């Protein structure tokens, strides 16, 4: 399989759902199925933090989520763990600035999808030059899901990436809700990534559907 093109990547980013077992109050597999039914376009397993599964339980959980994504034809991305991504033959991996370096990740992952979190123009350019397929930019708004986040950038911070000539597909990250999705897309993002807006929603299906509507209205 050749590397994904910019146009193909940008079509996968509109509703990017990130979840681990510890992000849900309901059964995680049902939450993911409801989100898939509602229209998520890409999924990332982020099984880390307090209460996260480890060892074989983590691998088994990942396989179950991956199988669901395959059923719906939605790419399955692994957060941070390149070895797990390779073991599962996942569609790709997402790495932060404190995770394994992009050059090493690209060598290991071949032509799979690689996303990189970028907080500055310099980080973005380095990621692009060394093989990133998309950038996760944020946090756009304050978030309670991640405890180790950088300073909030706002939609102006996201727009700055575009103003500086960054044409790589971008997904906005951090504190995104149905209500502020349109502003993120209008600032230049190809999509929004959410955790709690879907994982803790009363109806993951309805929340996903509304997020997709907001993105599509603004693209």
Curated annotation (Swiss-Prot):
Gene3D superfamilies: Aldolase class I (3.20.20.70). Mg(2+) binds at residues 80, 99. CDD domains: TMP_TenI (cd00564). 4-amino-2-methyl-5-(diphosphooxymethyl)pyrimidine binds at residues 44-48, 79, 117, 146. Keywords: Magnesium, Metal-binding, Thiamine biosynthesis, Transferase. InterPro entries: Aldolase_TIM, ThiamineP_synth_sf, ThiamineP_synth_TenI, TMP_synthase. One of its GO terms (molecular function) is magnesium ion binding. Binds 1 Mg(2+) ion per subunit. Pfam families: TMP-TENI. Pathway: Cofactor biosynthesis; thiamine diphosphate biosynthesis; thiamine phosphate from 4-amino-2-methyl-5-diphosphomethylpyrimidine and 4-methyl-5-(2-phosphoethyl)-thiazole: step 1/1. Its cofactor is Mg(2+). One of its GO terms (cellular component) is cytoplasm. One of its GO terms (biological process) is thiamine diphosphate biosynthetic process. 2-[(2R,5Z)-2-carboxy-4-methylthiazol-5(2H)-ylidene]ethyl phosphate binds at residues 143-145, 175, 195-196. PANTHER family: THIAMINE-PHOSPHATE PYROPHOSPHORYLASE, THIAMINE-PHOSPHATE SYNTHASE. Condenses 4-methyl-5-(beta-hydroxyethyl)thiazole monophosphate (THZ-P) and 2-methyl-4-amino-5-hydroxymethyl pyrimidine pyrophosphate (HMP-PP) to form thiamine monophosphate (TMP). Belongs to the thiamine-phosphate synthase family. This is Thiamine-phosphate synthase.
